[in-house]
A protein has these predicted regions:
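Bacterial N-terminal signal peptides
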Residues: 40-53
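Amphipathic beta-strand/beta-sheet edge segments enriched in Tyr/Trp
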Residues: 62, 127-199
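Short beta-strand->alpha-helix linker/helix-N-cap micro-motif
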Residues: 66-133, 150-151
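Residue-level detector of Asp-centered blade-edge/turn motifs that repeat once per structural unit
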Residues: 211-212, 255-256, 299-300, 343-345, ...
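Hydrophobic beta-strand positions that form the internal "hydrophobic ladder"
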Residues: 216, 260, 301-305, 349, ...
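A flexible loop/linker signature enriched in serine peptidases of the S9 family
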Residues: 220-227, 243-246, 263-272, 286-291, ...
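Short loop/turn segments that connect beta-strands within beta-propeller blades
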Residues: 232-236, 276-280, 320-324, 365-369, ...
């Protein structure tokens, strides 16, 4: 028998006891309303809306998997359902929520080889003394790691005990042991599963925190207006944030999760608005005149870049977190839109410019110097920088023009070498990619199934899943953590 060490988590507190762009480029059926900027918006709309296609090109490549942390050998993981530890009537419902959520979180991580439950032995362990190593480390499961535990309801509280065992290590198998306590609700069971999954991913995924508790902000028209919504990373718990009855686009959550910047039509035209997630309401933010679109936070949360036509052509400006100290950092004929910061260094900004004709991706230092063109042809929009600063992902129609085949697809490019690979090949318009905090996943919008919906995939283009289905849903933005 092996000594079991547990960490006890109660609600949101942990006690150790010995034991982790952009402008609305296409808004079909939407009427833009401005006072003095109708022409500028028309230019933006013309620049960033058309239906097109592209031919498939490069396949998945090893340098992508390595750079995104997907290149490591996958750990063979067995995750049997947790067992009930009490006979309370709520046990069955909470166990189902917990077990389904834990499995999905670990499967979605992209770094595990999940052993099929059909291979599991009949004797499922709920505690360490019940583990039969030979039943798990040999055929048919052939697992390297085993996740197991129990859940029990007592009164209004639920307690979950969970372990991660290296079943190849017979002398010291325990990698992780945790105990969680919270109110006995399905939401709490789901939260506990997310927390435990993140712990497992952190331990087995190279010390990179999991994304099971992260959120995705997006635009939805399901209420009759384009409002800002938020959902869990897997598409669950979709809920409305704004109720402005207008057109709101380009939601961008701050790195600390306390503020949400977005573009919206107001009485004065297109403005940048700021929403406090702590106060659950809009807070004061300056108006700059002209058309103001596509806000983007710096990695430290102290600055905001956005596109504004306040001086004529749409240009990129930077302000502090309160909207003051405005500074223009681009100056060239033609629209400059959709800025995004290098998320690792904060020293560079990628953006979309029409200075060469059709929109292309460019990079520059955060002060506007050292401008470099990234894409060399076609129609490229919606850049997003990976958390490690190595990759840019964007929407690209490489062969654009009359008679050109295909639609807009998501591409990934190494920012230094300019090597690129196509991630989507499924027709329709694929646009507005955004990186997960761990750099292993990308969320994007796609019209492949008809209307615009939000999808996610691993950063190598595999495991594509639809997250939304009600109404039109666009412009996703993954939280920073």
């Amino acid at each position: 028998m092996h000594k079991s060490n547990l960490q006890f988590d109660g609600g949101h507190h942990t006690i150790s006891r010995g034991l982790r762009a952009g402008i609305g480029k296409r808004t079909t059926g939407t009427r833009y309303v401005t006072i003095k900027s109708r022409l500028v918006v028309a230019v933006f709309f013309l620049l960033l809306t058309a239906a097109f296609r592209v031919t498939p090109c490069l396949a998945q490549q090893d340098w992508i998997k390595t750079g995104t942390g997907l290149g490591m050998e996958k750990v063979r993981l067995a995750v049997p359902d947790f067992k009930p530890s009490t006979s309370d009537a709520k046990n069955a419902d909470l166990l189902k929520v917990f077990n389904d959520t834990l499995w999905n979180d670990l499967e979605n991580a992209g770094i595990f080889d999940m052993a099929s439950k059909s291979f599991y032995p009949l004797a499922i362990p709920g505690t360490p003394t019940e583990v039969q190593f030979s039943a798990w480390n040999g055929p048919p499961p052939n697992a390297s790691m085993l996740v197991f535990g129990n859940l029990g309801v007592t009164g209004n509280n639920v307690t979950v005990q969970g372990w991660l065992y290296d079943v190849k290590n017979l002398t010291s198998p325990q990698v992780l042991g945790k105990q969680y306590q919270d109110t006995a609700t399905p939401a709490a069971a789901r939260t506990i599963a997310h927390k435990f999954a993140n712990e497992i991913i952190f331990r087995l995924g190279g010390g990179i925190p999991g994304i099971a508790e992260s959120q995705i902000y997006f635009v939805s028209s399901r209420s009759g207006h384009k409002e800002i919504w938020v959902m869990d990373y897997d598409g669950a718990n979709q809920r409305q944030i704004t109720h402005l009855g207008s057109i709101s686009l380009s939601p961008r959550i701050s790195p600390d999760g306390s503020r949400l910047a977005f573009s919206s039509v107001t009485k004065s035209g297109w403005d940048i608005l700021m929403y406090s997630m702590d106060l659950n309401r809009l807070v004061s933010f300056p108006k700059y005149g002209g058309t103001n679109l596509s806000p983007a936070w710096s990695p430290d949360g102290t600055r905001l870049a956005f596109s504004s036509s306040r001086s004529g052509d749409p240009e990129i400006y930077v302000v502090d977190q309160s909207g003051g100290n405005i500074k223009r950092i681009t100056s060239f004929k033609g629209p400059d839109v959709s800025p995004v910061w290098n998320r690792k260094t904060g020293a560079q900004i990628a953006w979309v410019s029409g200075r060469s004709g059709l929109p292309q991706i460019y990079t520059m230092e955060a002060d506007g110097t050292n401008v470099q063109r990234v894409t060399d042809q076609g129609y490229a929009v919606s850049p997003a920088w990976s958390p490690n600063g190595q990759f840019l992902v964007f929407a690209w129609t490489r062969h654009y023009g009359p008679g050109a085949p295909g639609a807009s697809d998501i591409y990934l490019m190494d920012a230094a070498s300019k090597q690129w690979v196509q991630l989507t090949h499924d027709g329709g318009r694929n646009d507005f990619p955004s990186w997960s905090p761990d750099g292993r996943h990308i969320v994007f919008q796609s019209s492949r199934a008809g209307g615009e919906q939000i999808w996610s995939m691993l950063a190598d283009g595999s495991n594509q899943k639809q997250l939304t289905s009600t109404g039109g849903n666009t412009q996703p933005n993954w939280s920073w953590k």
